[in-house]
Amino acid sequence: MAATSLMSALAARLLQPAHSCSLRLRPFHLAAVRNEAVVISGRKLAQQIKQEVRQEVEEWVASGNKRPHLSVILVGENPASHSYVLNKTRAAAVVGINSETIMKPASISEEELLNLINKLNNDDNVDGLLVQLPLPEHIDERRICNAVSPDKDVDGFHVINVGRMCLDQYSMLPATPWGVWEIIKRTGIPTLGKNVVVAGRSKNVGMPIAMLLHTDGAHERPGGDATVTISHRYTPKEQLKKHTILADIVISAAGIPNLITADMIKEGAAVIDVGINRVHDPVTAKPKLVGDVDFEGVRQKAGYITPVPGGVGPMTVAMLMKNTIIAAKKVLRLEEREVLKSKELGVATN
């Protein structure tokens, strides 16, 4: 009983959003009277979170524990995947986490990949494990995600972690949705009783964002107590507008450039852009990254807005580092029915 209680307290401390933000942030209701939205810097927030993780890692190591280790499996030659993995391993170095990238050709069989995952699952030196998505078409991504040990699943994609998140229980939260949640909480944007629209229903991004925002703030894994509407590819834009124009918070994770425009947003709303789209820039004649939101138009009307790039992206990497230290501390122990052994908790036994 004592072990379970102590585990819950330790898990709560690790998984709770921090409120010691050093950024000077404008109260939500005041942002609405500005001529232009407050642009939320995901880079600054991510830097703060990485500083918190680094301090936690060094305290963990100073207490006699081994330095956390993250293993990343990268399949194929997708340039975007290589870039994302490089960002993750660089962030790991910044926060004091050891990391390795295991590169495999796109021709690797599903069984070979499963065998590699099983080997890393059973390696005590590996605390966090992720397989960079997307994978080649001949490999079942869901089977691969479920093969990663839920205790090491720093992406939060295992069915156990997804299920526990949906039940408002402690779990490894998916990094991008958790990053969106932290942006909202650390910026001081209220969610209780507010109307939220999430554009996009993907199982790794849109759905988890909606779950985090609408669930009960008094539960084991506190939610936002918001009223959430989810749209998807079959939602006509005019129907979407009927919802967004009433929303206090609009989160777009659909992967459609200019999906959200100024006429769809009410004055003072918070707009979080999760979309990442490569489009042709007519000025430079080169590709450029944009989100789902017409940034220049919407910023004239919204209260808060995140840019692309520099918004949600850096937060995703920061939350991945947070999940890795959680995995290293073995706080969740999902495969052992959530109960830590007394010796792991430092509890004296007779």
Curated annotation (Swiss-Prot):
Keywords of this entry: Acetylation, Hydrolase, Isopeptide bond, Magnesium, Mitochondrion, Multifunctional enzyme, NAD, NADP, One-carbon metabolism, Oxidoreductase, Transit peptide, Ubl conjugation
Misc. comment: This NAD-dependent bifunctional enzyme has very different kinetic properties than the larger NADP-dependent trifunctional enzyme and is unique in that it requires formation of an enzyme-magnesium complex to allow binding of NAD.
Modified-residue entries (N6-acetyllysine), positions: 50
Entry protein name: Bifunctional methylenetetrahydrofolate dehydrogenase/cyclohydrolase, mitochondrial
Catalytic activity: (6R)-5,10-methylene-5,6,7,8-tetrahydrofolate + NAD(+) = (6R)-5,10-methenyltetrahydrofolate + NADH; (6R)-5,10-methenyltetrahydrofolate + H2O = (6R)-10-formyltetrahydrofolate + H(+)
InterPro entries noted in UniProt: Aminoacid_DH-like_N_sf (IPR046346), NAD(P)-bd_dom_sf (IPR036291), THF_DH/CycHdrlase (IPR000672), THF_DH/CycHdrlase_cat_dom (IPR020630), THF_DH/CycHdrlase_CS (IPR020867), THF_DH/CycHdrlase_NAD-bd_dom (IPR020631)
CDD domains (alphabetical): NAD_bind_m-THF_DH_Cyclohyd
Lineage: superkingdom: Eukaryota
Gene assigned in the entry: MTHFD2
Residue range of the transit peptide in the UniProt record, numbered on this chain: 1-35
Keyword Cell cycle in annotation: no
Chief location category: mitochondrion
UniProt-reported outcome of changing residue 233 to K: 50% decrease in NAD and NADP-dependent dehydrogenase specific activity. Reduced affinity for magnesium
Single GO cellular component term: mitochondrion
Species in which this protein is naturally found: Homo sapiens (Human)
UniProt record, GO biological process: folic acid metabolic process; formate biosynthetic process; tetrahydrofolate interconversion; tetrahydrofolate metabolic process
EC number(s) from the headed UniProt entry: 1.5.1.15, 3.5.4.9
